[in-house]
């Protein structure tokens, strides 16, 4: 298949690219001329500006030509001498009927460029895919069984944990009760209980009692004195 049409398009785009590069070069020289202190700055500035505008016009014209050529050859293959069709990006290849023959020819050429694949290689690839799928299924089954085992183990261990927790709670509550009794004892110790003591002191006597005691004492003294007098009389 001839590729002159495609090559022409590539050459045209390359020329446009070169013109854009030269345009940028001329713009840089224009700024250098403007910043220099030569006497003929005005003439050189004008000539370089004219060259820049001419390059811009050529680039615009060439781009418009390429856009026109691509627009004319989109979806058809009889607009150029090589019969090349330009496909847009959004074209559905399954539903279009334009350029089907050319498309099939290009696919055959691509298949010819690829190395041939033997049947043994195809079988090896299919066997490897099958083994990989079997391994994936085994791993999935193992994961499911592991999840089931964990669920059963959790269902068994949960009652044991609940029993342990209840036993721990009862153990924790019993020391609390004992401590409460001890606290009561500590709050009211036996030594600090106010027990009324038996009074060992003699009962207090009033003022009248004191007078009676003094009178009794005087009587006793008088008796003693009389006894002493009697003894002296006996002795004499």
UniProtKB/Swiss-Prot annotation:
Per the record, its GO cellular-component terms are:
mediator complex
Its subunit composition reads: Component of the Mediator complex.
Q: What does this protein do?
A: Component of the Mediator complex, a coactivator involved in the regulated transcription of nearly all RNA polymerase II-dependent genes. Mediator functions as a bridge to convey information from gene-specific regulatory proteins to the basal RNA polymerase II transcription machinery. Mediator is recruited to promoters by direct interactions with regulatory proteins and serves as a scaffold for the assembly of a functional pre-initiation complex with RNA polymerase II and the general transcription factors.
**GO molecular-function annotation terms?**
transcription coregulator activity
Q: Where in the cell is it found?
A: Nucleus
Q: Which UniProt keywords apply?
A: Activator, Nucleus, Transcription, Transcription regulation
Family note: Belongs to the Mediator complex subunit 11 family.
The residues forming the signal peptide are none
**Which cysteines form disulfides?**
none
Give a yes or no for keyword Nucleus in this entry: yes
Gene name, per UniProt, is MED11
One Pfam family of this chain: Med11
Q: Where is this region: Disordered?
A: 136-236
Q: Which InterPro entries match?
A: Mediator_Med11 (IPR019404)
Q: What is the lineage of its organism?
A: Eukaryota, Fungi, Dikarya, Ascomycota, Saccharomycotina
Q: Which domain of life is it from?
A: Eukaryota
The GO biological-process annotations, alphabetized, read as: regulation of transcription by RNA polymerase II
Task: Enumerate composition-biased segments (Basic and acidic residues).
Answer: 136-152, 168-186
Asked if the keyword Nucleus belongs to this entry, the reply reads: yes
Biased segments, Acidic residues type: 226-236
The protein depicted here goes by the name Mediator of RNA polymerase II transcription subunit 11
């Amino acid at each position: 298949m001839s590729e002159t049409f495609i090559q022409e398009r590539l050459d045209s785009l390359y020329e446009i690219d070169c013109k854009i590069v030269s345009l940028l070069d001329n713009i840089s020289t224009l700024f250098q001329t403007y910043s220099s202190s030569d006497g003929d700055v005005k003439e050189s500035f004008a000539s370089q500006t004219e060259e820049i505008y001419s390059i811009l016009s050529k680039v615009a014209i060439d781009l418009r030509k390429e856009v026109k050529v691509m627009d004319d050859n989109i979806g058809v293959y009889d607009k150029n001498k090589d019969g090349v069709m330009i496909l847009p990006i959004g074209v559905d290849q399954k539903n279009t009927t334009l350029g089907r023959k050319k498309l099939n020819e290009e696919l055959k050429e691509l298949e010819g460029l690829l190395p041939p694949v033997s049947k043994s290689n195809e079988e090896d690839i299919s066997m490897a895919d099958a083994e990989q799928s079997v391994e994936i299924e085994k791993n999935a089954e193992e994961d499911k069984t592991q999840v089931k085992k964990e669920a059963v183990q959790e269902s068994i261990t949960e009652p044991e944990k609940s029993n342990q927790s209840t036993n721990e709670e009862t153990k924790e509550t019993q020391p609390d009760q004992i401590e409460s009794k001890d606290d009561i004892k500590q709050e009211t110790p036996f030594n600090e209980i106010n027990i009324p003591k038996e009074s060992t002191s003699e009962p207090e006597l009033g003022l009248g009692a004191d007078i009676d005691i003094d009178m009794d004492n005087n009587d006793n003294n008088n008796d003693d004195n009389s006894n002493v007098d009697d003894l002296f009389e006996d002795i004499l």
